[in-house]
Amino acid sequence: MDIIVLAGGLSTERDVSFKTGSMVASALKENGHRVILLDVFMGYSDKEENLDGIFDRADEISVKVDDIPEVAPDLAAVKASRKDQSPCFFGPNVIRMCQMADIVFMALHGENGENGKLQAAFDLLGVKYTGSDYLSSAIAMNKGMAKQLFLSLIHI
């Protein structure tokens, strides 16, 4: 399978996400899959017309985890280092690359990867992904609502 492991993003848990993503990507590669570890915020800045055969160049395209500091990220510095300087959640070519994959493995940590918004976008775009659907993610992220829902199920 051709798999995008989506990690990073603009979260205080950016570094943890890359560690998770790196381990997942390694395990998937060991099992014969073609895998790209992709930073959802930084994206891949090659021209869109050069995306053909991206999974043949997976090692070249993947985020180099050794370059990621093991300390809490300076999110202002991360924003400033994005080539296109866009504030958009998705970096260059992220959506297109995810659409080209057989599935996207969600290795994002923090609100933006777990609150259901990304899952809803992928549902609308027809992108297959791992984990909970958008509604389940949104409910689980709201701890008060999740607690009420679970307590109501006890009495059924």
Segments and roles (model prediction):
Residues 154-156:
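Conserved small/polar residues in nucleotide/adenosyl-binding loops
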Residues 1-135, 139-152:
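ATP-binding N-terminal substructure of ATP-dependent carboxylate-amine bond-forming enzymes
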